[in-house]
A protein has these predicted regions:
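Extracellular glycan-modifying ectodomains
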Residues: 2-28, 32-450
Length: 450
C-alpha cells in the first residue's frame, strides 16, 4: 500500500476530504505560520477554548458508519451479481445438454438452403424391411425412395432425361391394367391342368425417379396399374407375383440401365427372388455364382437422347451346367452349353448376352440339384424376360421360353398343345409394364393359343 493510502486509512480522524494532496502541500506553509485550519476555519486552540475539547469525533464516526454501509451494500451487490451470473451459466449449460440429447447422432445439421423435396432418402435412414407377407401382398405397394439430388431433368419426346439417365414414360391407365388381366384370365382358362402365374415388371421411371420428379413428368402411376391388374386376375386360376416391392427395396442399386429401356441382370435377380418366395422355392444365391461384365453398352435410348451414360452389362455364371436349345426365326435349331452368349461385345447389342436375344423358342435344361425332377415351366415373354429366365434353371429341370411375337411362326402347335406335349407343369405370363399395356402385344399373346 502507498504512503498516501496508509495516511488515508490510518489517520482518518484528521483527514479532510475536501483537500487533495496538492492542496495539502500548498497550504502546509500557511498552516505553519498561522492559525487557520486546512479548510480556512479558525484552528482549534485548546488554550483559547478554555480547556474544553470540542466534540471532534462525532463527524468522523458518521463517516465511518456511512462508509461501512456502502461497503456492506457493495458486498451484497457483488454477491448477488455472482449468484445471478452463476444461475444463468447453469441454465445455459443445462439447455445445451438437453439440446444435444434430443438430436440424433446420425444426422448432421446443415446451413445450406435447399428447395422443398419429396420422397428423398438422402438424409434419412432406410426403413426396416417389411415382412415377407407384406412384400408379396398384391394389395401392398411400397413407394420407391431413390436418392434425390434436387436437380431437374428435361423431357425429350417419350423419355425423360435426368442425371444422364434415360427414363421411358408410361402412358397406361388403371383401366388398361384391368384389360390385361382379363386377357390373362381367358388364356389361363385354356390351360386348366397347369399352375399359372403372372408377373408385371415396373420400369426405370417408377423405380429411379424421385416422387418430386414423377409428379412433374408426363408418366402415370405404374403401381396403380399393376395393383388393378392383379386385383382383377382370377384367384382360382392365376397367381400374381408382386416383384414391385422387391425392386422398390433395391431402387438405389444398379437394377436398370441408364441408356436402355431394359433392366439389368441384378434387377431381374431381385424379381426372381420374389417369384421363388411366392412359390416357396429356394432362391439361387448370387454369391455362389461368378459375375462377368461387358462394359460400354449403349442402349436403345441413346439415339433418342445423346449424352446418356454408357452401361455395363453384368451376368452370373451358375455353379451347375445348363444346356440351351434355340429355335431361330427360320426354324433352325442351335444348341449351346450356357444360357449366355459369352462372346457378346461392347456396343448397342450387349443386352443380347441373355439367352442370345429374342428368339421364337428357347429351351434350357438344368443340372441344378435344387431343380425338382419333372418340374417344367413355360414362360411367355418379351425382351424384358431375357435377363430373368436363366435364374429359373436353379429350380426347374426344364425352362421353355416363348417370345409372344414369334413363337407361332416356328411351332405347328398352339401354346396349350405345346404345354401338354412337353409336360409343362407351370406357366408364367411375364411382361414389362409397357408390354402389359400394349394392345399389339396383348393380341400377340392371345394368338399363341390359336
Amino acid at each position: 500500500m502507498s504512503d498516501r493510502n496508509s495516511f488515508d486509512y490510518l489517520n482518518l480522524d484528521n483527514f479532510d476530504e475536501s483537500l487533495d494532496s496538492r492542496d495539502y502541500r500548498r497550504r502546509r506553509p500557511e498552516r505553519r505560520g498561522g492559525s487557520m485550519s486546512y479548510s480556512g476555519r479558525p484552528s482549534y486552540d485548546r488554550r483559547r477554548s478554555g480547556g474544553r475539547r470540542p466534540n471532534s469525533r462525532r463527524p468522523s464516526s458518521r463517516r465511518r458508519r456511512r462508509r461501512n454501509r456502502r461497503r456492506t451494500r457493495n458486498r451484497i451487490v457483488i454477491v448477488l451479481s455472482f449468484l445471478l451470473v452463476f444461475a444463468l451459466l447453469i441454465t445455459l449449460i443445462a439447455t445445451m445438454i438437453n439440446g444435444c440429447g434430443r438430436r440424433s447422432p446420425s444426422v448432421t445439421t446443415s446451413t445450406e438452403t435447399k428447395p422443398p423435396q419429396q420422397a428423398t432418402v438422402a438424409a434419412t435412414a432406410p426403413p426396416a424391411r417389411a415382412s415377407k407377407e407384406d412384400m408379396l401382398s398384391i394389395s401392398n405397394y411400397i413407394e420407391p425412395q431413390p436418392i434425390d439430388d434436387n436437380t431437374d431433368g428435361e423431357e425429350t419426346g417419350a423419355i425423360y432425361v435426368w442425371n444422364r439417365n434415360g427414363f421411358e414414360l408410361f402412358g397406361g391407365s388403371e383401366d388398361s391394367g384391368v384389360y390385361y388381366a382379363d386377357n390373362v384370365n381367358k388364356l389361363a382358362a385354356k390351360i386348366p391342368t397347369v399352375n399359372v402365374y403372372s408377373m408385371i415388371v415396373p420400369n426405370h421411371t417408377e423405380m429411379g425417379l424421385p416422387a418430386r420428379l414423377r409428379g412433374k413428368v408426363n408418366s402415370n402411376s405404374q403401381a396403380a396399374n399393376i395393383k388393378n391388374a392383379y386385383a382383377a386376375m382370377s384367384s382360382g386360376m392365376v397367381k400374381p407375383i408382386n416383384a414391385y416391392n422387391y425392386l422398390s427395396e433395391h431402387c438405389n442399386e444398379y437394377i436398370y440401365f441408364k441408356s436402355d429401356h431394359h433392366w439389368t441382370g441384378l434387377g431381374a435377380y431381385y424379381a426372381y427372388t420374389a417369384f421363388a418366395d411366392t412359390l416357396g422355392l429356394p432362391a439361387l444365391s448370387l454369391s455362389d455364382c461368378t459375375e462377368a461384365k461387358i462394359p460400354g453398352f449403349t442402349g436403345t435410348l441413346t439415339d433418342l437422347a445423346p449424352g446418356l451414360d454408357t452401361d455395363t452389362v453384368s451376368y452370373w455364371k451358375f455353379p451347375y451346367t445348363v444346356t440351351m436349345d434355340i429355335t431361330d426365326s427360320s426354324g433352325t435349331k442351335h444348341t449351346y452349353d450356357s444360357p449366355y452368349f459369352e462372346q457378346e461385345e461392347s456396343g448397342s447389342l450387349s443386352y443380347g448376352v441373355f439367352i442370345y436375344g429374342d428368339n421364337p423358342l428357347t429351351v434350357m435344361r438344368s443340372s441344378s440339384d435344387k431343380a425338382q425332377q419333372g418340374k417344367k415351366i413355360a414362360v411367355i415373354k418379351e425382351s424384358y424376360g431375357n435377363a430373368f429366365v436363366p435364374y429359373l434353371t436353379y429350380n426347374y429341370e426344364e425352362v421353355h421360353v416363348m417370345d409372344m411375337r414369334t413363337f407361332r411362326t416356328v411351332s405347328t402347335d398352339n401354346f396349350a398343345a405345346y404345354c401338354e406335349k412337353n409336360g409343362i407343369t407351370d406357366v408364367l405370363f411375364f411382361n414389362g409394364i409397357m408390354s402389359a399395356n400394349n394392345q399389339d402385344l396383348l393380341d400377340s399373346t392371345a394368338a399363341l393359343f390359336n
